[in-house]
Structure formats: C-alpha cells, structure tokens
C-alpha cells in the first residue's frame, strides 16, 4: 500500500504543472482506492479539511446532513490532515472507524494527507496556486 501511495504521489507531482482543472486530479480514498475527480464533472464539490480531535469535529454531523440532502448534486470530500496541532493523529483505519461510528459518515473521505508544508498533497498545492483563493466566486 505504501508503494502505491508513493508511486501515486510521484505521478501527481510530475503531472501537477500541466493541470488546468481540479477535475484532472485523482485522490486516494480512505480505503486506499484511486478516485478520479473527473467523475464529478458537472457537480459542485466541497473540499473540507477534517480532524477527529478538533473543536470542530461535530462538523461531521452537519456535513453528513448536507450530503444526505444534496448528495445528488454536491460532492463532499473530507481531507483528514494532521497539520494543525496534531488533531488527526490516527491512521486511515482509525479515522474511518471514528467517522462511521460517531457520525455515520458516508460522504467521500480521502486518505490522510498533508495540506501545507514541504509534504503538501499535490491537489492542495495546486489549489493554493490558483487565483481567487478566497473562493468567493
């Protein structure tokens, strides 16, 4: 599995410079499967940094409610990251169990990534390089 993640990361790094759309990225899900964001063309996407030991952990319940109500047209993707105060120390399996057991999460979750720093995930590096980073439209 680590080998797959490593190869996937290298591929994303090498192709990142040529990407013009978020739909050109793939993510690795919390289950270790590759999910192409191109599958969500025509839908709105909401990317949410998540952490199981954060003061905002209850956001999972609200996100799940939104997913249940609008999931046909809106794709929610949770991106667990341990970049802020060590609030997501668990493994992918730990995170998945926590989210399912405590909040009934059924929206898409990525594997645990880094969203800042030297080891930033390629998708978030690309997002940060885009104009209109405030996402105000």
Regions found by a protein language model. Give the residues of each.
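Sec-dependent N-terminal signal peptides
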Residues: 3-14
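N-terminal "domain-start" segment that seeds a small globular fold
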Residues: 17-38, 58, 122, 130
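Amphipathic alpha-helical repeat scaffolds
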Residues: 29, 49-53
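Conserved helix-turn-beta segment immediately C-terminal to the redox Cys motif
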Residues: 43-45, 53, 57-82, 100-103
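Extracytoplasmic/secreted proteins, especially bacterial periplasmic and envelope-associated proteins
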Residues: 58, 62-65, 90, 94, ...
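Thiol-based oxidoreductase modules, predominantly thioredoxin-like and allied folds used
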Residues: 73-90, 106-117
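Thiol/selenol-based redox catalytic cores and closely related redox-interacting motifs
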Residues: 99-100, 104-137
């Amino acid at each position: 599995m680590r080998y797959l993640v490593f190869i996937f990361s290298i591929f994303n790094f090498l192709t990142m410079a040529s990407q013009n759309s978020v739909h050109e990225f793939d993510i690795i899900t919390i289950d270790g499967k590759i999910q192409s964001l191109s599958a969500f063309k025509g839908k709105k996407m909401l990317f949410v940094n998540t952490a199981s030991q954060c003061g905002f952990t209850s956001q999972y319940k609200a996100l799940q409610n939104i997913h249940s109500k609008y999931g046909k047209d809106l794709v929610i993707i949770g991106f667990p990251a341990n970049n802020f105060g060590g609030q997501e120390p668990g493994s992918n399996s730990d995170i998945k169990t926590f989210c399912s057991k405590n909040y009934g999460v059924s929206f898409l979750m990525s594997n645990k990534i880094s969203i800042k720093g030297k080891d930033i995930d390629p998708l978030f590096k690309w997002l940060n390089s885009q104009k209109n980073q405030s996402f105000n439209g």
